[in-house]
From Swiss-Prot:
EC number per UniProt: 6.1.1.17
Gene Ontology molecular function, alphabetical: ATP binding; glutamate-tRNA ligase activity; tRNA binding; zinc ion binding
NCBIfam families from the UniProt entry: gltX_bact
The keyword Protein transport is annotated on this UniProt entry: no
Biased composition (Basic and acidic residues): 117-134
Reaction(s) the record says it catalyses: tRNA(Glu) + L-glutamate + ATP = L-glutamyl-tRNA(Glu) + AMP + diphosphate
Protein name: Glutamate--tRNA ligase
Residues that hold ATP according to the record: 259
Compartments in which it is found: Cytoplasm
Organism: Rhodococcus jostii (strain RHA1)
Gene Ontology CC: cytosol
Family to which this protein belongs: Belongs to the class-I aminoacyl-tRNA synthetase family. Glutamate--tRNA ligase type 1 subfamily.
Length: 491
């Protein structure tokens, strides 16, 4: 390797919705680049016209922006190796194909899959072994005969006759024995370059020094090593990058996490109200960690500590409960004003709040729930009693059945009488009045004393602290709701 600058790339295909495995790959590449003072290159592999979509491309951009994984080169940023969309680089790829053919590193192959199978059968081999290198040494006359038949050749790389070994940054020394990987196709029969060619060619032309990717791509590495050897001989590549293969992310049971699993969908987590810091922290733990007793950390802490050699090669299991717990910790770590702003934006985006809200009331209310939620979507059930139109306020039937029975009548009567006399409508005064009336004078235990008041005022048996909630709600609305609840109670 002849370059001292670390250059890594994240090169997703724009198909479907971004999933957590993809994001983990982006995160580890980003952290590796930042830790080493290198460059994080974002490249789009959009060469599958049947599956690629502009919607998916925009979703990937949206995901990276939301997570704060900024790229140094790539779409919308530019850089010295433009363009960064693979579909716009075909002339570069075809030029490399031509050079490989001219140098004898690659050759045209005319065999059909059926012919390959028949040759295997005739030789007593498994017919599913794959390509048998038959076309390696066709004579010019044989080639011309196939062309005269109208056959369209694919171009194949001539694999070397030596073992292909690399020191994997995650798995250690890995070897594919000579002869285990057949000559592989670089183009389709119509001449269009395949992923097997374009991915390493773009890495070589963009001077990528380290390739960190999922373990599912491990089997493609010997092909890419062979292609790099050939590209160095023809002057296209200056060096072969280091490879590291990240462990599988598993779902429930012993299955690999699938795109069909809801927890794999990045935007489902965002819509539930994960904060980027929480999700990135949890994804970092899928194969890596700072230490056993340091599960919660910031992105800056991750960058400072990140060591690719410490990534565990064993499969990592996605645990939604652990992810939620990590997110809850990050919510608690936010400055109150930052948390309030994020929660306000989230509840507005999801249609719970309008554009006009008493921001002072909201900021105070947000601080009351910051330590009580796991994801941002949890907050609305706790706060909606403060922001719904009074005509839409309703008490949860289950909470009413449990807490607003006939025995709540004297509690509500005493609460109303004591609150009517309160002069300063603040949490301390409300607490003093209600404790005196309900605990001291009625002799009730706190749960029996305050549950009917809480349900009457907030509509639920679960809410932010009662006295602070009533202070925010105000005297008129609080008393009106208590009177309405009392009117619905027999006795």
């Amino acid at each position: 390797m002849t370059t001292s600058e670390v250059r890594v790339r994240f090169c997703p295909s724009p198909t479907g919705t971004p999933h957590v495995g993809l994001v983990r790959t982006a995160l580890f590449n980003w952290a590796f680049a930042r830790h080493n003072g290198g460059s994080f290159v974002f490249r789009i592999e959009d060469t599958d016209a049947a599956r690629d979509s502009e919607e998916s491309y925009q979703a990937i951009l949206d995901a990276l922006r939301w997570l704060g994984l900024n790229w140094d080169e790539g779409p919308e940023v530019g850089g010295p190796y433009e363009p960064y969309r693979q579909s716009q680089r075909r002339d570069l790829h075809l030029d490399v194909v031509a050079k490989l053919l001219a140098a004898g590193e690659a050759y045209e192959s005319f065999s059909t899959p059926e012919e390959v199978e028949e040759r295997h059968k005739a030789a007593g081999r498994d017919p599913k072994l794959g390509y048998d290198n038959f076309d390696r040494d066709l004579t010019p006359d044989q080639r011309q005969a196939f062309l005269d038949e109208g056959r369209k050749p694919v171009v194949r790389l001539r694999m070397p006759d030596h073992d292909l070994t690399w020191d994997d940054l995650v798995r250690g020394e890995t070897t594919f024995k000579a002869g285990t990987v057949p000559d592989f196709a670089l183009t389709r029969g119509n001449g269009i370059p395949l992923y097997t060619l374009v991915n390493p060619v773009d890495d070589a032309l963009m001077k990528i020094t380290h390739v960190l990717r999922g373990e599912d791509l491990l089997s493609s590495t010997p092909r890419q090593l062979a292609l790099y050897e050939a590209m160095q001989r023809i002057g296209v590549a200056d060096f072969t990058p280091r490879f590291g293969h990240l462990p599988f992310v598993m779902g429930q049971g012993n299955k690999k996490l699938s795109k069909r699993d809801p927890e794999s969908n990045l935007f489902i987590h965002r819509d539930r109200g994960f904060v980027p810091e929480g999700l990135l922290n949890y994804l970092a733990l899928l194969g890596w960690g700072i230490s056993d007793d340091h599960d919660v950390f910031s992105l800056d802490e991750m960058v400072a500590a990140f060591d690719i050699s410490k990534v565990n090669s064993n499969p990592a299991r996605f645990d939604q409960k652990k992810a939620d717990a990590i997110n809850a910790e990050h919510i608690r770590l936010l400055e109150p004003a930052d948390f309030a702003a994020r929660l306000r934006a989230f509840l507005t985006l999801h249609g719970h709040l309008g554009e006009t809200v008493d921001e002072s009331v909201f900021a105070t209310a947000a601080e009351l729930v910051q330590t009580r939620i796991v994801v941002l979507s949890d907050a609305w059930d706790l706060l909606k009693f403060l922001f719904v139109d009074e005509a839409d306020f309703a008490i949860d039937p289950a909470a009413a059945a449990k807490n607003l029975g006939a025995d709540s009548a004297p509690v509500l009567d005493a609460a109303l009488a004591s609150l009517d006399a309160v002069e300063a409508w603040d949490a301390a005064s409300l607490e003093e009045a209600l404790k005196t009336a309900l605990v001291d004078e009625l002799g009730l235990k706190p749960r029996k004393a305050f549950a009917p008041v809480r349900v009457a005022v907030t509509g639920s048996h679960i809410s932010p602290p009662l006295y602070e909630s009533m202070e925010l709600l105000g005297r008129d609305v609080s008393l009106s709701r208590l009177r309405s609840a009392r009117a619905g109670v027999a006795g």
